[in-house]
């Protein structure tokens, strides 16, 4: 099996198959067209440029195409890139499939669903429990398959469920320390806060934003879903209003995409643990790619900072 692209060092040659995650056309300073390809395997992805692109190349090297690549890893503007020597589409007889290139969550889907189901089972407030169970059941397949984002954090198969399970464990630890928190409300907020992404995003492969995702966003999508669920279940209670508030406020600030700031305790904690889990996985993924004593590439979503891996972290 070929070494994952994230394990290759600068100067090494690469000769392996990739899945094209995205393909974007550009015009070089000499006026000639080129394609920026994001090439993906199970370890991560790397950018490559296809210079002097022909008109047919846009179709030949479109997203979700499997390609055979020969190239060299080099460093450019703080990030690794792949300098292409040769690229071609994979043939039908080459025994490769899209599944071979998809990064997946480290916990099996059935285990994650069992965890989510157990947290719902433990809820004591019937209104919160019924709404949460209803929406999880409605979108169970997508919930277990979709990434949590198109980029930046948990952008892999089952990333949404993995993000939620990690946050549930954080929520439990915090609620153990601060018993005044409403566990049912906090757990429901964790489970539902990003569920609108099953409509906002296109799916787990070559993830992009849907029309609904671009025009509405996952927050407003989920508020609408909550209203529908409450109506179908004939629940007319304040819990519905507070759950909507948790969804609307989980990004924390208007400049981060929240229509409202957190105004109940559980909304504040939901925002913190969402932010914490997203940042932790971004740091961990960046640090996995470097050796002790080295700095990571700059992480745009973390104020474009680099992170250092101490030499005693062998």
Swiss-Prot record:
Keyword Nuclease among record annotations: yes
Broad class of enzyme this protein falls into: hydrolase
Keywords: Exonuclease, Hydrolase, Nuclease
Location of the HD domain: 163-279
GO molecular function: 3'-5'-RNA exonuclease activity
Coiled coil: none
PROSITE patterns documented for this protein: HD
GO process annotations (BP): rRNA 3'-end processing
EC code(s) of this entry: 3.1.-.-
Keyword Nuclease: yes
Family membership: Belongs to the YhaM family.
Job description of the protein: Shows a 3'-5' exoribonuclease activity.
PANTHER family cross-referenced by the UniProt entry: 3'-5' EXORIBONUCLEASE YHAM (PTHR37294:SF1)
Protein name listed in UniProt: 3'-5' exoribonuclease YhaM
Source organism (scientific name): Bacillus velezensis (strain DSM 23117 / BGSC 10A6 / LMG 26770 / FZB42)
Record lineage: Bacteria, Bacillati, Bacillota, Bacilli, Bacillales
